[in-house]
């Protein structure tokens, strides 16, 4: 009627009859009533039905089934920590964390990396290449991930939330640093005096107290500072900029801290 070859119809009918017969056997064996099936029980029975059908297939058919998408495939386990990977190459890369092996070396500075992709990204420091550009403001980046984080400045997206105080962050590393406020963890310790810090950047700035290094110089008077923030703050002395305004009396200040001190005394005067 539909124009299919007779042999095809017979073959299809034969397979259908076999499946119906097998389904009936399974129904009896597992005491399954399709009319009473709901949700997971129906799914579990169908899964069992497919599994037992698979066991009846030839080894060749089962091998093809196991290689098909959606079917559990071979996993590669790390002998050191037990972590599993779907690809052998991913396991090899992971194992270098345990062995410390870094076979990819930068020819310009000698720094080594576990993965070739990391070396390629690093080399952009030397070449100045920044292939990832923000469509919003035109700023360019050497890494795709850095661009993704930057774009959240424009969108306001902060997908990483602290489970303790619900404060949100643009990237995962900032969230990790923030969590140390709650845990009290300070993993970065000064070798000179033993003082510990929650952020690596804070340790770097602190070390300058011991070394005397002041890499940020004022363009007006050449006075130098340990941090860029202090240098920018000092620059307001020359420009006369006073961006911090008291909402009660209108007086303005160059530093936020100075405004805070003033507001305490200002509010006391107004209440008298």
Curated annotation (Swiss-Prot):
<feature type="zinc finger region" description="C2H2-type 4">
    <location>
        <begin position="160"/>
        <end position="182"/>
    </location>
</feature>
<feature type="region of interest" description="Disordered">
    <location>
        <begin position="50"/>
        <end position="69"/>
    </location>
</feature>
<feature type="zinc finger region" description="C2H2-type 6">
    <location>
        <begin position="216"/>
        <end position="238"/>
    </location>
</feature>
<feature type="binding site">
    <location>
        <position position="143"/>
    </location>
    <ligand>
        <name>Zn(2+) 3</name>
    </ligand>
</feature>
<protein>
    <recommendedName>
        <fullName>Zinc finger protein 32</fullName>
    </recommendedName>
</protein>
<feature type="binding site">
    <location>
        <position position="122"/>
    </location>
    <ligand>
        <name>Zn(2+) 2</name>
    </ligand>
</feature>
<dbReference type="GO" id="GO:0005634">
    <property type="term" value="C:nucleus"/>
</dbReference>
<dbReference type="Pfam" id="PF13912">
    <property type="entry name" value="zf-C2H2_6"/>
</dbReference>
<feature type="compositionally biased region" description="Basic and acidic residues">
    <location>
        <begin position="50"/>
        <end position="65"/>
    </location>
</feature>
<feature type="zinc finger region" description="C2H2-type 3">
    <location>
        <begin position="132"/>
        <end position="154"/>
    </location>
</feature>
<comment type="function">
    <text>May be involved in transcriptional regulation.</text>
</comment>
<feature type="binding site">
    <location>
        <position position="106"/>
    </location>
    <ligand>
        <name>Zn(2+) 2</name>
    </ligand>
</feature>
<feature type="binding site">
    <location>
        <position position="266"/>
    </location>
    <ligand>
        <name>Zn(2+) 5</name>
    </ligand>
</feature>
<feature type="binding site">
    <location>
        <position position="81"/>
    </location>
    <ligand>
        <name>Zn(2+) 1</name>
    </ligand>
</feature>
<feature type="binding site">
    <location>
        <position position="140"/>
    </location>
    <ligand>
        <name>Zn(2+) 3</name>
    </ligand>
</feature>
<dbReference type="InterPro" id="IPR036236">
    <property type="entry name" value="Znf_C2H2_sf"/>
</dbReference>
<dbReference type="Pfam" id="PF13465">
    <property type="entry name" value="zf-H2C2_2"/>
</dbReference>
<dbReference type="GO" id="GO:0008270">
    <property type="term" value="F:zinc ion binding"/>
</dbReference>
<feature type="zinc finger region" description="C2H2-type 2">
    <location>
        <begin position="104"/>
        <end position="126"/>
    </location>
</feature>
<feature type="binding site">
    <location>
        <position position="160"/>
    </location>
    <ligand>
        <name>Zn(2+) 3</name>
    </ligand>
</feature>
<feature type="binding site">
    <location>
        <position position="200"/>
    </location>
    <ligand>
        <name>Zn(2+) 4</name>
    </ligand>
</feature>
<feature type="binding site">
    <location>
        <position position="78"/>
    </location>
    <ligand>
        <name>Zn(2+) 1</name>
    </ligand>
</feature>
<dbReference type="GO" id="GO:1990837">
    <property type="term" value="F:sequence-specific double-stranded DNA binding"/>
</dbReference>
<feature type="binding site">
    <location>
        <position position="156"/>
    </location>
    <ligand>
        <name>Zn(2+) 3</name>
    </ligand>
</feature>
<keyword id="KW-0539">Nucleus</keyword>
<comment type="similarity">
    <text>Belongs to the krueppel C2H2-type zinc-finger protein family.</text>
</comment>
<dbReference type="Pfam" id="PF00096">
    <property type="entry name" value="zf-C2H2"/>
</dbReference>
<feature type="zinc finger region" description="CCHC-type">
    <location>
        <begin position="244"/>
        <end position="266"/>
    </location>
</feature>
<feature type="binding site">
    <location>
        <position position="109"/>
    </location>
    <ligand>
        <name>Zn(2+) 2</name>
    </ligand>
</feature>
<feature type="binding site">
    <location>
        <position position="126"/>
    </location>
    <ligand>
        <name>Zn(2+) 2</name>
    </ligand>
</feature>
<feature type="binding site">
    <location>
        <position position="94"/>
    </location>
    <ligand>
        <name>Zn(2+) 1</name>
    </ligand>
</feature>
<keyword id="KW-0677">Repeat</keyword>
<feature type="binding site">
    <location>
        <position position="197"/>
    </location>
    <ligand>
        <name>Zn(2+) 4</name>
    </ligand>
</feature>
<keyword id="KW-0479">Metal-binding</keyword>
<feature type="binding site">
    <location>
        <position position="246"/>
    </location>
    <ligand>
        <name>Zn(2+) 5</name>
    </ligand>
</feature>
<feature type="zinc finger region" description="C2H2-type 1">
    <location>
        <begin position="76"/>
        <end position="98"/>
    </location>
</feature>
<feature type="binding site">
    <location>
        <position position="262"/>
    </location>
    <ligand>
        <name>Zn(2+) 5</name>
    </ligand>
</feature>
<keyword id="KW-0863">Zinc-finger</keyword>
<feature type="binding site">
    <location>
        <position position="213"/>
    </location>
    <ligand>
        <name>Zn(2+) 4</name>
    </ligand>
</feature>
<feature type="binding site">
    <location>
        <position position="217"/>
    </location>
    <ligand>
        <name>Zn(2+) 4</name>
    </ligand>
</feature>
<keyword id="KW-0862">Zinc</keyword>
<dbReference type="InterPro" id="IPR013087">
    <property type="entry name" value="Znf_C2H2_type"/>
</dbReference>
